[in-house]
From Swiss-Prot:
The record marks 178 as: Activates thiol group during catalysis. CDD domains: GAPDH_I_C, GAPDH_I_N. The gene is GPD. Keywords: Cytoplasm, Glycolysis, NAD, Oxidoreductase. It catalyses: D-glyceraldehyde 3-phosphate + phosphate + NAD(+) = (2R)-3-phospho-glyceroyl phosphate + NADH + H(+). Its EC number is 1.2.1.12. This is Glyceraldehyde-3-phosphate dehydrogenase. It is an enzyme of class 1 (oxidoreductase). Gene3D superfamilies: Dihydrodipicolinate Reductase, domain 2, NAD(P)-binding Rossmann-like Domain. It comes from the Eukaryota. GO terms for molecular function: glyceraldehyde-3-phosphate dehydrogenase (NAD+) (phosphorylating) activity; NAD binding; NADP binding. It comes from Ogataea parapolymorpha (strain ATCC 26012 / BCRC 20466 / JCM 22074 / NRRL Y-7560 / DL-1). Its main location: cytoplasm. SUPFAM superfamilies: Glyceraldehyde-3-phosphate dehydrogenase-like, C-terminal domain, NAD(P)-binding Rossmann-fold domains. Belongs to the glyceraldehyde-3-phosphate dehydrogenase family.
Length: 335
């Protein structure tokens, strides 16, 4: 059964979600809404991408439509989601990638406009969060508004799940070394809630807060209250890396941890969790569709119960792939 989809917000995630969705036979993207992007500009932004390269296909625009490989996708420019004619256009599922409507109250506007389900492509304070490969099978059809959590939670959760299932986690601290995102500044500018966040993105390492580690406790209740973390924003355009330092319940060796991660990556979490023992750097993971790639050569064990683990993720492309995976799962369960 084909899922009829609308995308609200045509930024980094919205455009990559569309690229990925177009490759799936059971997804039909009908419309896009972005108050700041007209159809001609949407075509340009979709066609050319400084990070992931030029779109391999034809991209044009005709009037109010974005035309990709001959397929017409209507472009709306409504500021208020309640005014987007999702119902009239036959859209059942909305992917909200604005970063603005992240609560149930905000996302409800899409339902009011005729959509049946909304997936928020950001963490949410009150909508249930799902991470593919970790807790997505707990989704039930009565849930109309849900969150795909954050890119960092999608990297950390599969890693933490495997470690906790095998050795048990007493407690842990996470640091994500995170690439620049659109909210940062090209030169020093005002940022009243986060003063450091207002400093030049391309010339600084910027400590920042993140709820990604605590959010793991929402998708893995066994780890609630056991993980927290922070972020270091660094001057790279894409690909980030999680550094997870944990106290384990069960003593082990680093070699055994690597074997456990490799087994999980080749088994139940294939395509979501990856494994590498090569001398890789961040750019080697550009446009990698996996949520998390465990780096066997980067971690270190101090004692049999105290270990630092490292896992890479394309915070744009890997995350966008999971958004589409979650959409497919929701559509299948809801059919």
């Amino acid at each position: 059964m084909t899922a009829n989809v609308g995308i609200n917000g045509f930024g980094r995630i919205g455009r990559l979600v569309l690229r990925i969705a177009l490759s799936r036979d059971d997804i039909n993207v009908i419309a896009i809404n972005d108050p700041f992007i007209a159809p001609d500009y949407a075509a340009y932004m979709f066609k050319y991408d400084s990070t992931h390269g030029k779109f391999k296909g034809t991209v044009t625009h005709e009037g109010k439509y974005l035309v990709i490989n001959g397929k017409k996708i209507e472009v709306f420019q409504e500021r208020d989601p309640a005014n987007i004619p999702w119902g009239k256009e036959g859209v059942d599922y909305v992917l909200d990638s604005t970063g603005v409507f992240t609560t149930i109250e905000g996302a409800q506007k899409h339902i009011d406009a005729g959509a049946k389900k909304v997936i928020i492509t950001a963490p949410s304070k009150d909508a249930p969060m799902f991470v593919v490969g970790v807790n997505h099978e707990e989704y039930t059809p009565d849930i109309k508004i849900l969150s795909n959590a954050s890119c960092t939670t999608n990297c950390l959760a599969p890693l933490a799940k495997v470690i906790n299932d095998t050795y048990g986690i007493e407690e842990g601290l996470m640091t994500t070394i995170h690439s620049i995102t659109a909210t940062q500044k090209t030169v020093d500018g005002p940022s009243h809630k986060d003063w450091r966040g207002g400093r030049t993105a391309s010339g600084n390492i910027i400590p920042s807060s993140t709820g990604a580690a605590k959010a793991v406790g929402k998708v893995l209740p066994a780890l609630a209250g056991k993980l927290t973390g922070m972020s270091m924003r660094v001057p790279t355009t894409d690909v980030s890396v999680v550094d997870l330092t944990v106290n384990l319940k069960k003593p082990t060796t680093y070699e055994d941890i690597c074997a456990t991660m490799k087994k999980a990556a080749e088994g139940p979490l294939a395509g979501i969790l990856g494994y590498t023992d090569e001398a890789v750097v961040s750019s080697d993971f550009l446009t990698d569709s996996r949520s998390s790639v465990f780096d066997a050569k980067a971690g270190i064990l101090l004692t049999p119960t105290f270990v630092k683990l490292v896992s890479w993720y394309d915070n744009e492309y890997g995350y966008s792939t999971r958004v589409v995976d979650l959409l497919q799962h929701v559509a299948k369960v809801s059919a």
